Amino acid sequence: YTPDNYEYRSYQSLNIVTKHSNNTGTESILIAVLAYREQARKERGVENPEIVAAVTAHPALYKACRYFGVRLVKVPIDPVTFQMSLKHTEKALNSNTIAIYASVPTFTHGVIDDVESLSKLAQSRNIGLHVDNCLGGFLTSYMEKEGLLKKAKLFDFRVKGVTTMSVDVHKYGFASKGVSVVAFRDASLRQHSY
């Protein structure tokens, strides 16, 4: 990328401070969950952390929650759109909730969760919003640019409430097999991943 490149300029202007490069998308999700857990313990005193996710969440989230002692609160998907149910997500949020997990797209159906609406819920509760963009990270960005996503909604750091994103660079990003990245909106959250 060059400074004259639109994508470079727009992402630089978002002040995204940092990322972790990892061996797999699973590791990216593990690191994000660890960061949310530690941040909630240190800053809010949360002892029984929970993450709210749709039943269609990638199995890596189940593993991350099991490893780090985080309760996974599964909510149904909307029967019409197959997106994470906003109504059920809102009902599931409580003082132990450390983050909402959204998929872009879902592993099972290829549906993009309503990240903008989930972001509003996360911001209203002062919790994180992780966007699992491992499966479609590069494709969804270019599909949007080329006008191939009908009724496209924002799903990345352009949405204020998105605090972390996982992206598999090896899927259509021309990187070595397994290379993944977890990006943090700011360095203060990343500090909690160590």
Regions found by a protein language model. Give the residues of each.
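Conserved PLP-enzyme active-site core in the AAT-like
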Residues: 8-13, 20-193
